Amino acid sequence: MITHDNIWDAIDEIARENNLSPSRMAINCGLDATTFNKSKRCDAFGKSRFPSLRTITKVLNEQQMSMADFGAICDRQSHEATE
């Protein structure tokens, strides 16, 4: 099963693979530089916050990736978490 952490880890991995910080990747995608900050991944009550589909789509378009590519990274993150 893909979790909140898998999705955020996939976004972090995409940034790393492209030699970008998460902040730089956000800027390149036309997003606020703080979009991918760890502090924004949960709300004030500790409830997990997922990135929107719009945000994920901007990342995929900027990095010329498909949703299948993103799903594969999330799936790999999921399997690594259970090992």
Model-assigned labels for residue ranges:
Residues 1-24:
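A short, Lys/Arg-rich alpha-helix, primarily the initiator
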Residues 16, 27, 61:
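Alpha-helical residues within the helix-turn-helix
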Residues 21, 32-35, 52, 66:
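Short coil turns linking two alpha-helices in DNA-binding domains
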Residues 38, 61, 68-83:
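Short, charged recognition helix plus adjacent turn
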Residues 11, 25-26, 36-39, 70:
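Conserved hydrophobic/aromatic packing and binding residues within compact polymer-binding modules
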Residues 8, 19, 50-53, 64:
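Residue at a beta-strand N-cap/secondary-structure junction
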Residues 44-61:
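Short, basic-rich loop-to-helix N-cap that marks the start of a DNA-contacting helix
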Residues 30-49:
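Recognition helix of helix-turn-helix/homeodomain-like DNA-binding domains
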